[in-house]
Design a protein with these regions (language model features):
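Phosphate/diphosphate ligand-binding glycine-rich loop within oxidoreductases
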Residues: 1-47
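Short glycine/serine/threonine-rich phosphate/pyrophosphate-binding segments
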Residues: 78-82, 103, 139-144
Length: 247
């Protein structure tokens, strides 16, 4: 995880769980199986992280979602999960993103999609929102096209679900829940195990694949057949079979 053992010299190769760790394997003369590259990892990053935002907000005493206006910055893995759960809980969803980045399925769950460069529309949405949450992974993304003062004056509860400060220096840490730290980190279980077990199964599968034969050096992505086999097990025996269509 996060290339924690990248400096070691394995006799067979590495299995890496996270995208953030991949760059540290550059130049390694061995195979690196990247579990993060497949569909299965979306169960954790999309569904698991999306669910955890609402669980964290409930822990803080904000659990009434029906009809609430939420502005979500980003429509990648984490953003898509937030959009999915916001829609399921009855929120009116506005997403700020690059239009080319949002899938048709995710777009269908949104009331409004705003181009990330449209500062006027972003300002209006943030000014009237009940909730604002960032999930772009880009420092300062929220204030790139919208003045920081708009967020400071808004009545919305501001939160961040990325590791970067996506609000920028113009929005004080005290204005954002948990001082801009990823909100789900307040939870005892930031991501529930039911959203992680398939990823761990794929991680273990990677070790079996590397051990079963000579693999070429470089990054190796999970093959479709392996992922579909594990997903079939999840659908049959898991507790989130009704959610898997969202990945």
């Amino acid at each position: 995880c996060a290339a924690a053992f990248a400096e070691l010299k394995p006799s067979i190769g590495f299995v890496e769980l996270t995208r953030s760790g991949v760059s540290k394997y550059a130049g390694k003369n061995c195979p690196v199986y990247v579990a993060d590259s497949g569909r299965i990892k979306r169960i954790e990053t999309c569904l698991g992280t999306g669910e955890s935002y609402f669980r964290a907000m409930t822990l803080l005493g904000h659990g009434d979602w029906q009809g609430k206006s939420i502005v979500i910055f980003g429509s990648g893995k984490v953003g898509s999960g937030l959009i999915t759960y916001a829609h399921r809980y009855g929120c009116r969803v506005t997403v700020v993103t690059r239009p080319s980045d949002i899938s048709d399925r995710v777009r269908s769950l949104c009331e409004t999609v705003i181009d990330a460069t449209d500062g006027i529309a972003i300002t209006e949405a943030v000014s009237t929102a009940d909730l604002v949450v960032t999930a772009t992974g880009v420092p300062g993304a929220a204030t790139a096209s919208c003045p920081a003062d708009v967020f400071n004056r808004s009545k919305a509860l501001l939160a961040n679900m990325g590791v970067e400060d996506e609000y920028g220096a113009g929005v004080p840490a005290g204005r954002v829940l948990e001082a801009k730290r990823p909100l789900n980190f307040i939870l005892k279980d930031p991501t529930l195990m039911k959203y992680i077990d398939a990823t761990m199964a794929l991680h273990n599968e990677g070790a079996v694949i590397l051990a079963s034969g000579k693999m070429p050096s470089g990054l190796i992505e999970p093959d479709d057949a392996t992922e579909e086999r594990l997903l079939s097990i999840c659908r049959k025996n898991g507790t989130i079979s009704d959610e898997l269509d969202y990945i």
